[in-house]
C-alpha cells in the first residue's frame, strides 16, 4: 500500500468500496478533508470501509494521534461523492469530537 510513513495502522478497504488504479485518471492535485459524522477510532473507520456494499472509503483516517490508511494512494477512494474530485484527491476522514447539531472536530 503506497502512502504516508506517518500511518500508525493499515487496514485494507474492501475492494468493492474504491477504484483500483489511479494512473489512467491523472495525477493527485488536491487533498480532501472530511469529517466522519461520528466519534470514531481509526479501527472503527477501517471496519466501516471493509464492509461489503458500503460504497465509500477514504485513503486515511485520523482520530486523536492515530492515523489509519485504508486505500493506497495509487488507487481512488470514494469519499467526495464526486467522481472527478475523487480521481484527483487524497482523502482524509477525521473523527468528530462531538455530535449533532454542530459536529465539532478537535485539533
Predicted segments with their positions:
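Active-site-adjacent loop/helix surface patches within enzyme catalytic domains
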Residues: 1-107
Amino acid at each position: 500500500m503506497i502512502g504516508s510513513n506517518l500511518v500508525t495502522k493499515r487496514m485494507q478497504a474492501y475492494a468493492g468500496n474504491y477504484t483500483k488504479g489511479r494512473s489512467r485518471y491523472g495525477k493527485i492535485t488536491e487533498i480532501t478533508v472530511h469529517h466522519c459524522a461520528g466519534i470514531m477510532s481509526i479501527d472503527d473507520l477501517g471496519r466501516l470501509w471493509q464492509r461489503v456494499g458500503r460504497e465509500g472509503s477514504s485513503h486515511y483516517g485520523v482520530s486523536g494521534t492515530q492515523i489509519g490508511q485504508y486505500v493506497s494512494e495509487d488507487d481512488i477512494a470514494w469519499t467526495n461523492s464526486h467522481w472527478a474530485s475523487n480521481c484527483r484527491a487524497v482523502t482524509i476522514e477525521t473523527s468528530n469530537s462531538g455530535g449533532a447539531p454542530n459536529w465539532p472536530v478537535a485539533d
